[in-house]
């Protein structure tokens, strides 16, 4: 299985970049996007501990919605990492549709700091949606 990761820097002046890892074990067999190695999650996020949370990309104008995993710096809040507005928005897009099922402070759970990666299977449909993210 192939995976596509978008590195989302906390610094909005830096561009979002895409990275593909090929021929990996699928999630149902215990696989996933690699943590170690070249372009692994630790390298892309620039940290030693990662928390994986659900996130989504939504483009209302294009009618696109893509659910995926957001790999975040787990220690970022403790070490004063910069707020990642773009990754926080992806967390918001995931949580907003279920707002009525969440606690009133649910938006606090959208706050992401440091560099992050949005990871999805590298299917043809997902690649097309991800291209629109990179073009925006």
Task: Please state what every model-predicted region is.
Residues 1-136:
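Domain-length accessory/inserted modules outside core catalytic folds
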């Amino acid at each position: 299985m192939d995976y596509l990761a978008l590195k989302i820097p906390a610094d909005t002046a830096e561009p979002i970049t895409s990275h593909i890892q090929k021929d990996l074990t699928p999630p149902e067999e215990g696989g996933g996007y690699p943590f170690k190695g070249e372009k692994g999650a630790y390298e892309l996020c620039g940290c030693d501990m990662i928390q994986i949370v659900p996130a989504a990309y939504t483009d209302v104008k294009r009618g696109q919605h893509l659910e995926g995993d957001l790999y975040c710096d787990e220690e970022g809040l403790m070490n004063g990492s910069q707020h990642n507005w773009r990754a926080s928005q992806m967390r918001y897009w995931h949580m907003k549709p279920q707002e009525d099922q969440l606690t009133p402070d649910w938006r606090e759970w959208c706050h992401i700091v440091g560099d992050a990666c949005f990871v999805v299977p590298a299917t043809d449909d997902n690649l097309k949606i991800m291209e629109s993210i990179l073009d925006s």
